[in-house]
Amino acid sequence: MPHVKATAGQPTNKMPVPEHVVIPMSMHIGAPAEPVVKKGDTVMVGTVIGKAGGFVSANIYSSVSGTVQDIAPLRMVNGAMTTAVAIKTDGAQTVDPACVPPVVTDKASLLAAVQACGLVGVGGAGFPTHVKLAANTIDTLLINAAECEPYLTTDCREMLECSDTIISGITAVMKYCEIPHCIIGIERNKPECIDLLTSLTREMKGVEVKGLPMRYPQGAEKTLVETCTGREVPQVGPSGKPGLPADVGCVIMNVTSVSTLGKFLKTGIPLVTKRVTVEGDAIARPQNIEVPIGTLYRDVIDACGGVKEGVELGKIIFGGPMMGGAAPSADFPVLKQNNGLLLFSKKAAALPEPSACIRCGHCIEACPMGLEPVVIAQDFANKDFAALKARCVDLCVACGSCTYACPAKRPVSQTMGLAKGWYMAELRKGGK
């Protein structure tokens, strides 16, 4: 698979403050945050505008200084509804005086700091970080710096530009969570990052930088655990639910997530900005750009020169080409976990006509989880709950490898997603 990492060598640009931002209360797995501001309120960078709605949730902060214009329902790009806070910016980017470095002395205070930061997995999943760090059975911290998806280079730039906060974040997690080992996994197509972090961690006890095979999806958590430690995450964990890295003594943090923690411990400023790779053959100036969370993607596109002259825009993808999703427009906000915006011309975006499945098994060979997409598709067509359970459809990580491998050009990954969604819905209803 082509890597297409053209922006990896370009320093990150900072976007001018937009006139408006729209900040959703749901940018994470778990309960949405509850708005704690009202229309007309003045906010600053780092002002709490949404309080976590439970343990598996995360605080939401204003990414700009300005005035709350509205609090209203918002349909997200995936079709889900949430509440969002719309803010008119004043351009000053005044930081809230409440943003002070936290005092961390033990695991409890570190977890409180992580929660106060509003930190979630910024590599894509959006799982609240304080929840995963709360486990007491961890002996290995895995830093996911694989960044295996084509086009995306945000983690690469984080390593080259913010290595100091990566190190301070790792140090804090290892010290206060009493984790003796840390492995930083980086795909071998980023030799500068490997060399830099190897030199910075050489004297750090228990820390290893590991060059990973350039194989998609190397960054998938179960693949990462096996490649870095040799341990195999079980299909089913002790709780009866799908196995987790914690079941084999591992906790995974994205490299930008751990860097964000390092920055928060130093400055007290929570997660309010996001680096986004803007790429594709239809964008005028491909680049990595740092933007306030809640910035509309159309404003990001404008900051990158807009659509290339003479090119007819065919598709907008939020995220990478494998795991991202096509969007009907650019009128959606940047979220904590967004890391890519791809614009393709009509020619590049054109999809071949699918043909009949020839049962070649390429999708089975390509699946990193060892699933059988061709068989699962038939089980889903038959709405066979027992068969889908037996074939572990809930283990699908939506990596897109099956679609990429299919010679018939069938939308296999989409079918897998529908099958998993139907299965999980039936499971919640007590399906057997």
Residue ranges and their predicted role:
Residues G121, L141-D155, A282:
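Gly-rich Lys/Arg/Thr-decorated short loops/hinges at beta-loop-alpha junctions or inter-strand turns
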Residues N339-P354, I364, P368-Y404, A408-K432:
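Ferredoxin-type iron-sulfur electron-transfer modules in oxidoreductases and energy-metabolism complexes
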Residues L160-Y176:
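Histidine-anchored nucleotide/phosphate-binding helix
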Residues I179-Y297, C304-G310:
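Hydrophobic alpha-helical positions that pack around
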Residues M1-V36, A86:
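N-terminal, Lys/Arg-enriched amphipathic/low-complexity engagement segments
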Residues D70, R75-F127, K132-N136, P191:
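Acidic low-complexity segments
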Residues A33-T42, G46:
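Short histidine-centered loop motifs in beta-beta connectors
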Residues G66-V68:
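Conserved hydrophobic positions within beta-strands
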